[in-house]
Amino acid sequence: MPKTVGVAVSNATFHFDKLYTYAVMPDQQDTVRLGSMVLVPFGRGSRARMGVVLACDAEPESAKLKFLFDVAPASACLTPELLRLVHFLKERTFCTYYEAVKAVIPYGAQYKPTVAEDGVTPVLQKQLVRHTENAYKLVGTLPPKPRPTAKQLAAVALLAGGERTLSALEEKGISRAVLDNLCAKGVLECSKVNKAIDLYSSIPLKNEPILLTEEQQAAYDALLPGLEDAAPHSALLYGVTGSGKTLVFLKLIEHCLQMGRRALVLVPEISLTPQMILRLKSQFGKRVAVQHSALNHTERLLQWQMIQDGGADIVVGTRSAIFSPLENIGLVIIDEEQEHTYRSESAPRYSAHEVARQRAAENGALLLLASATPSTESYYAAQHGRTQLVRLTKRYGGNPLPKVQIVDMRAELASGNPREISLAMEDAIRHNLEAGKQTILLLNRRGYQTVAQCEDCREVLKCPKCSVPMVYHKSAHKLLCHYCGSQLDPPPARCPACGGKLQYRGFGTQKAEEELAKLFPEARILRMDQDTTAAKDAHEKLLAKFARHEYDIMVGTQMVAKGLDFEDVTLVGVLGIDSLLFAQGFRAYETVFSLVTQVVGRSGRAKDPGFAIIQTTDPDNPVLNLAAAQDYDAFFEQEIAYRKLGLYPPFCGLCVVGFAGPKESEVARASARFAALLGRQAAKQPDLPLRVLGPTPGGIEKINDSYRYKLTVKCRNDRRFRNLIRETLTLYEQEKLPGKATVVVDLHSDGDI
């Protein structure tokens, strides 16, 4: 029963991010505890701000202390482990306390300020979501007159099989208005039911024995001691594409549950969650919860509460699922561990690997990283004994790795084929269609045409708010910026600079879809990119259709490259990858190798052998050739030599300090001043290993009218270095610069902001 509490408030700057002491009203003392979400008066005007209690009985009561406005229900209270994660994130990522809290609690579970019935007193909303919804059942017959509509007939037909909820009927295209009209006629009866917490109740429980090959069993046996030991362990499961890593996951999860413990499974993208959920729910039943950003607020909250109440034994999701309030964790799996999506690009800028390692340490769990193309850092750590290395070298079922052909697109153009689809690719797709098989094509550019260039002055049409070219989207007939969302509608025909004619060039997924339709008019083509998967559950529905062979060809961006498993896919094509070969960032080659290896591995995963074609203007590129050969070990030796020569991770830590603001001169001045302050502080610790580069403009100099500069610091990422950055940030905040820039610190960057 605390009488005073220390509260971290929302919207605090780094310099003012500390605990503020508040008095607790007598009627609140039974509900306030560490981790409580509260509403507090802040500042001279006592404006209402959200906060989290991080200390109790912070100091003796004082007449000067303000009282809490309101306290959220106990269900919104952070668990002790999640509270420790808040402190962990603040220390590791230079975020504020409340930024860490917002990362830990999903948006749908965050209480918001409102006012009491008097219209004045600040309070917290009383309920996050309605936990009930309408349900309808058939109680009468549909009268013949007036003539029933098609929707009314459909509703009656659906409800003939039993009661259904409004949300289930809306998914079938039946609106609430139709249902209410039928209720008024006495055909239906409406009642209130609790919202379903099981999002995938239609998946049948198979509960079949998990049968492993000899090699998979050996991998499982090697990992089992780390799972059974009460101390934390980490391991890297490195297996070629199609080697059956997921089966090893399932066997480990099964044993984890038998031990009375729980499992957390991370996948890098939302597109990969449906297949993983299907495997887990069909094997383990209802006690599987899901956490990712494609769920609506209600779904996320209900899933969160299910986990918090102990109703889930397994949680599967994307990066943010690492913060699930799961207790007694015995196993944490990070699938496709090399993916950049496990690193957050907004505050707090955390790595899911780092948080997973912390949670494994807290729970005495096994942290299992898995990939066919591990990150260079993870494989280096395994080679040097810092984590256990377990290999799967054979494809499941004994299938060979796909044969790969590299096509030189320069030679293709010279021979008279101006199209973006080579003759070899065209022949292979046609042969695959005739055989009744499916094809996956990777093109890492969405849109129709990617560049609008003036024929006279050669100027490229760029976004007015960003220093990047705009992309033409034919379906919407507009130019879009993929960074800030700006658009030109309709697209200009003339150059804004000189009035010359604009020529549209480039090749995106929309144009690829159109060209494929012309070449193969009989083929059913599915496009998978950010535009076609924006709707709720779009990933799941489109992939399910492809699995049912409702499409012959799937063309898409990176989301088609990883983790997908379709038996009838025997051909994979890489249409455009060259731009990534010349991308900025020290992980560029690793990204290309991983992407090509992963997408090639989508073919030939069942009884039929696979084949892949890589189109490129650089056919002798060693990275592409090593990816074509699926030779990770050779790639690693080449990459680690480059990292050592250039002093990049794993041979150092890489910290990027980013600066952004509306005036370039002020951003440049701010970055230079920060660099000077950092140098001054570092000089006090001459034994601290440090190499400072810059400041320089960012890789993309302007985004959304904000100019960007960066300072790159090669360091040893330890507490001592982080304290140095923290001291410098504090000094910078105290400076009275005429125009300051926003500062961010990223310890997991590829080298840019």
Question: Which residues does each predicted region cover?
Answer:
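Accessory, non-ATPase domains that flank or precede helicase/AAA+ motor cores in DNA-metabolism machines
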Residues: M1-S371, Q383-N399, Q681, R719-R726, ...
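Inter-lobe coupling/hinge segments of SF2-like helicase ATPases
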Residues: K206-T213, Q217, D221, A230-A668, ...
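Solvent-exposed, membrane-proximal periplasmic/extracellular interface segments of envelope transport
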Residues: P60-S75, T696-G698, K702-K714
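Short secondary-structure junctions
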Residues: T13, F520-A523, L678-R691, E735-K740
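A general secondary-structure signal for short beta-strands and their flanking turns/coil
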Residues: P2-T4, D17, S46, G436, ...
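Long hydrophobic segments that form regular secondary structure
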Residues: A672-F674
